[in-house]
């Protein structure tokens, strides 16, 4: 295949929701520049699972695994599409099956992001309070989780240098942007403008503590409305730390 096939694989907690929302909203502009990004659903908060279902199916335990027939169909349709020279697929689900993907598509390019493991741990805690009813105060783990770093290093050792596009994750407000990093790989950094809006906003400290306290009550029916309100209330709030220096 003389065309480019690119998989954005996340991993989790590295801005995938913002990337996928932007790509989904700009599908027509991308296609006009020769980049095919298949459509997918996006919820009211701009959150999506991306293109996972395009090439994956659930196994008996409900985990998404690569479906080689689906992948073949997608690649064949792309190869026969005269209007596109690049296929871009995005999903955090791809990170777990990255070895299967690179074996099935040896020339594939991979886009991924690395996040400070301390920030990753804090983000996981924030999410546990937001979405999973955690009522406990933050307690740092005894060891940092370096699993993502190790997986990416293993992938790097299996690919040619030009096949792996690995970037540092940028927090909102820091110089640079995960979306512009992706556009740079596509050669479209100057073609599309990127707003400073956030997707799946982290709670401010006050919102986080309020939600943690509320989690002791039966609030399942209010979760979506409450989450939308707390995200809106947290927009523009300053950064905070749950760890002492």
Task: Describe the function of each predicted region.
Residues 1-245:
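Anion-recognition interface
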